[in-house]
């Protein structure tokens, strides 16, 4: 009886190893005709890009900056305020400032970036960014309650990232 259990366990272990070795870690089923990623950049009020081809999209993840290209491992990532950099199919580089959001990287070499706001870097007004940074720094320093301090900190961190993106110093 024990030998039968051991034999069954060994067979199960061997089949489990075979199953685990078939796991995919990259989007290997993606189209073999292109070395490009298909991405969409979306906000609630605007579709900036829909199914656009790119070589690479660099994103400001909550756990650090990361790049997405064709064959990237599927994932869902929280995005923090920062810069999205798009290396387009033709080699052109484009940058957007986003307010945060989520990125969905799929096994079919597609990526959906959902954000509340996305603004081309060249459309950021340096003077407005400087004023916003000063305003939220003051709000943060003056905040007495935890809730007010947390709200001010969100604004401060967002404006700090905007300042960095457009080259404004404090």
From Swiss-Prot:
Superkingdom of origin: Eukaryota
Molecular-function annotations in GO: proton-transporting ATP synthase activity, rotational mechanism
Keywords: Hydrogen ion transport, Ion transport, Membrane, Mitochondrion, Mitochondrion inner membrane, Transit peptide, Transport
Residue range of the transit peptide in the UniProt record, numbered on this chain: 1-33
GO cellular component, as recorded: mitochondrial inner membrane; proton-transporting ATP synthase complex
Mitochondrion found in the keyword field: yes
Pfam families: ATP-synt_DE_N
Keyword ATP-binding: no
Single Gene Ontology BP annotation: proton motive force-driven ATP synthesis
Coiled coil start-end: none
Location of the protein in the cell: Mitochondrion; Mitochondrion inner membrane
Subunit structure: Component of the ATP synthase complex composed at least of ATP5F1A/subunit alpha, ATP5F1B/subunit beta, ATP5MC1/subunit c (homooctomer), MT-ATP6/subunit a, MT-ATP8/subunit 8, ATP5ME/subunit e, ATP5MF/subunit f, ATP5MG/subunit g, ATP5MK/subunit k, ATP5MJ/subunit j, ATP5F1C/subunit gamma, ATP5F1D/subunit delta, ATP5F1E/subunit epsilon, ATP5PF/subunit F6, ATP5PB/subunit b, ATP5PD/subunit d, ATP5PO/subunit OSCP.
Described purpose of this protein according to its UniProt entry: Subunit delta, of the mitochondrial membrane ATP synthase complex (F(1)F(0) ATP synthase or Complex V) that produces ATP from ADP in the presence of a proton gradient across the membrane which is generated by electron transport complexes of the respiratory chain. ATP synthase complex consist of a soluble F(1) head domain - the catalytic core - and a membrane F(1) domain - the membrane proton channel. These two domains are linked by a central stalk rotating inside the F(1) region and a stationary peripheral stalk.
Family (UniProt): Belongs to the ATPase epsilon chain family.
Identification of the protein by name: ATP synthase F(1) complex subunit delta, mitochondrial
Organism name: Dictyostelium discoideum
């Amino acid at each position: 009886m024990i030998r039968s259990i051991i034999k069954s366990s060994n067979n199960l272990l061997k089949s489990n190893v075979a199953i685990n070795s078939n796991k995919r870690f990259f989007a290997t089923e993606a189209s073999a005709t292109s070395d490009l990623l298909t991405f969409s950049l979306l906000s609630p009020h605007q579709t900036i890009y829909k199914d656009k081809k790119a070589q690479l999209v660099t994103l400001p993840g909550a756990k650090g900056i990361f790049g997405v290209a064709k064959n990237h491992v599927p994932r869902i990532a929280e995005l923090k305020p920062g810069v999205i950099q798009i290396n387009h199919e033709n080699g052109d580089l484009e940058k957007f400032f986003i307010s945060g959001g989520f990125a969905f990287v799929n096994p079919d070499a597609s990526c959906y970036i959902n954000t509340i706001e996305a603004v081309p870097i060249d459309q950021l007004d340096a003077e407005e960014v400087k004023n916003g940074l000063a305003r939220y720094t003051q709000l943060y320093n003056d905040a007495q309650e935890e809730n007010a301090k947390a709200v001010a900190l969100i604004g401060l961190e967002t404006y700090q990232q905007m300042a960095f993106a457009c080259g404004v110093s404090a």
